[in-house]
Amino acid sequence: MANEQNEQSQDLSSEQTTQDHEQTQTEGVEQGAEISVEDLKAQIGKLEESLKLEKARTANAVYEAEKVKERAEREADTAKKFALEKFAKSLLDSVDNLERAIQAAGKEKTPLLEGVELTLKSLTTTLEKFDVVSVDTTNGFNAELHQAVGIDPNAKSGEIGNVLQKGYTLSGRLLRPAMVTVGQ
């Protein structure tokens, strides 16, 4: 019987130990749960900050990419405009020759003269489509657009007397200055 009581005592002691152990585990889990929640909240805060930082970096990268794209488009437009410069300069000689042919023909309208005039008109229209336009010589002498090659005694001071050769610009940039005579 003492043996039975001893076994019952051990069983009770074992049950008590098991209950204490379970209670300790439950408290540990609860404390662990509290710590885990706090840790998770801290991690969430860190992740939110990291997300904000990455969003800002992404927005900055998108902004920079747009700026690079815009600059490349501008440079391509500029290159396209001025890539025609050498070609346009070559065509100006043809325009000059056609104008000289028209002047040399006189006032008599012949089919040949009409053909030359139509060719000149077609060529100048094509040049204007690509923003190649003649320099204005009606508003007086401008050293940036005109080259004075002589003096015209009949013209007023600062005025253009005769235009010896037309000047041209390409998209506002001077291709060739107008060769003119000016008054004293």
UniProtKB/Swiss-Prot annotation:
Keywords of this entry: Chaperone, Cytoplasm, Stress response
Gene3D superfamilies noted in UniProt: 3.90.20.20, Head domain of nucleotide exchange factor GrpE (2.30.22.10)
UniProt region (Disordered), positions on chain: 1-35
One Gene Ontology cellular component: cytosol
GO molecular function annotation: adenyl-nucleotide exchange factor activity; protein homodimerization activity; protein-folding chaperone binding; unfolded protein binding
Stretch forming the signal peptide: none
Subcellular location: Cytoplasm
Any GO BP annotation: protein folding
Primary location recorded for the protein, binned into one broad class: cytoplasm
Transmembrane segments: none
Pfam families reported in the protein's UniProt record: GrpE (PF01025)
Biased composition (Polar residues): 1-14
Keyword Cytoplasm (UniProt): yes
Subunit and interaction comment: Homodimer.
Family: Belongs to the GrpE family.
Function statement: Participates actively in the response to hyperosmotic and heat shock by preventing the aggregation of stress-denatured proteins, in association with DnaK and GrpE. It is the nucleotide exchange factor for DnaK and may function as a thermosensor. Unfolded proteins bind initially to DnaJ; upon interaction with the DnaJ-bound protein, DnaK hydrolyzes its bound ATP, resulting in the formation of a stable complex. GrpE releases ADP from DnaK; ATP binding to DnaK triggers the release of the substrate protein, thus completing the reaction cycle.
Name used for this protein in its record: Protein GrpE
Protein species of origin: Acinetobacter baylyi (strain ATCC 33305 / BD413 / ADP1)
